[in-house]
Amino acid sequence: MSEETKALNFIEHIIEEDLTNGLSKENLRFRFPPEPNGYLHIGHTKAIGVSFGLGEKYNAPVNLRFDDTNPAKEEQEYVDAIKRDIAWLGYKWESELYSSDYFQKLYDWAILMIKDSKAYVDSQSSDAMREQKGTPTEGGTNSPYRNRTVEDNLELFKGMKDGKFKAGEHVLRAKIDMSDPNMLMRDPLMYRVMYAHHHRTGDDWCIYPMYDWTHGESDYIEQISHSLCSLEFKPHRKLYNWFRDNIYEYAKNQLPLPPKQREFARLNLSYTIMSKRKLLRLVEEVVVTGWDDPRMPTISGLRRRGYTPNSIRQFIEKVGVAKRENVIDVSLLEFCIREDLNKSANRVMAVLEPIKVVITNYPEGKEEWLDAENNPEDENTGSRKVPFSREIYIEKADFKEEAGNKFFRLKLGGEVRLKNAYIIEANYVVKDAEGNVTEIHCTYSTDTEKRVKGTLHWVSVKHAITAEIREYNRLFIDEAPDSHKDKDLMEFINPNSLKTRMGYLEPSLSSAEIGDRFQFQRLGYFNVDNDSKPGALVFNKTVGLRDSWAKQKPKPQQNQQQKQPHQKRKAISVIQQLGKKYTNLPEEKQQKVKIEIQSLAKDVAYNELEALFGTAMKKAGTRVAVLIALKEHFKNGLERNENIDAFILKAKEDKNDVLVAEANEID
């Protein structure tokens, strides 16, 4: 999709308006300002994607600035991890900067604020200041120290800097308005005394600037044009502007561009918590093995689980930039990694719950090395050799002694195709003393052209290598584990979030290296974990081939009854039904419906879509659904024709914004 045809989000509209009103494109500059007090998580990727994405779109510099103003919680370990994660995602920053770079400049400006009676030293306790703050409906009370003389304030503030006072004895506050309806404007703190070793400045400072004072002024020093942050900071904008406007008077000759703060909805994900404090609790209480545990929503955890940078960037693009808070279904993130790995991951065979198959008419001691395609989505990946012998393993779940006509896997008297090999028929079984099947004795046929309905994966017993398999599931069983005020989030920990077993793998995997990703055919996507050692591979399950979580969730009986006829309808009919209300759905619901339409599109013939090209103008939702399905056909090689071009052009000229945006996504 070209930049010319892609619809602008509301932040891009703001930037375009600023450019139209005289802002030079050369003055565009953005930043990502993490606090180095923890590891980046999936929630941060939206802020990263927004700022760095704008940098890429406008060819503008993006600073990586560490907001390191609280030495009690910040460490170099987190700085290094943040840099590693952003680089892994594929983004490049213009300059690596730190708020601590500006400590002297901020201090000098604070002195000027005191001299202009815009700041004062308060000597009350934090409790007293809190009581004087007032409420959202009632104004606050002025501090008894609010009218200290400039001389006294300067002397006290310098004494704070020189370490003459205890922590909490004095603070510096901005002098604004204790009756302002916005409580953040009621004489906010600018500095506090803190005796803590800073990871960069050491013990040079014992006063540290507060977030609201540091944030905007750092933007101003760096000449950031657009300071982008999440919606929770929208009430802070008034204070951001107050500090900015006052400092601008001191420095406008050297720093001519005042920054602009704008807010967007942060990323909230179902079955996930985003609080660094609560994630730290999971680590400290050994619910997980560390910040990079594959069940953690940290970028390092996702990377270790097997997520790719491209899948996360695609996820952020699909989520989009919105003004309203919402919760994104984690299944969208899983969809993105499936889609990415489907294109890039080589197919291999692995058996996780084995049962032995003996092919009685295959010569003992004989072995063959059969050709197997690496990835049908990418012919450039070529093929590999897979060993076949008289004894193989298949999955226990792929065999039943007795089964109905709808069971297309192996059963007594039934035939299945072995992937890349022969067709076998189950003749009889061997059982142990408890009556459990231990072996299935089969015969094979070299007539591989025969039509059979089931195809199974397998590995040769003689050639299989073993590996530890870690199957991960969601860490929480509740969609919103952090939303229950009366319950501890630990009550919602999924006791089955990790299952470890030994698996049997085809021998080509013996050379797999840490980080390599594969599709274990019919099982899911897996990657080689960091814990792997030569001869002792460990694989993490990244995601299944389809969303199995939905099957595990208990559903009301009524919903189950309603779903049966829906599943039996033709795919094109379901797409039409999904499209009916599409344009009236909220963004999150639209995305879920879109994914469903994309999945159904493979079962729809082009002529079925073409029949809907004449859909009435007022049925915009149906036309959107047709466009979504068409795009899936384009991916599979459908060529454009006059009818398609006319349909797309008509959609681009429509009055419905959703329809126009969907049409504009097609080159």
Label each residue range with its predicted role:
Residues 6-15, 20-83, 199-230:
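N-terminal catalytic cores of NTP/NDP-binding nucleotidyl/phosphoryl-transfer enzymes
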Residues 22, 51, 82, 113, ...:
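Residue-level signal for inorganic ion chemistry
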Residues 33-36, 65-73, 95-104, 127, ...:
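Conserved short loop/turn motifs at secondary-structure junctions
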Residues 68-70, 76, 98, 112-279, ...:
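Active-site cores that bind ATP or allylic diphosphates and position pyrophosphate for catalysis
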Residues 78-102, 110, 117-119:
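A glycine-rich helix N-cap at a beta->alpha junction
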Residues 237, 243, 317-319, 327-572:
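Core subunits and conserved enzymes of cellular information-processing
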Residues 254-336:
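Long, charged, mostly alpha-helical binding arms that flank functional sites
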Residues 568-667:
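Non-catalytic all-alpha helical scaffold/repeat segments
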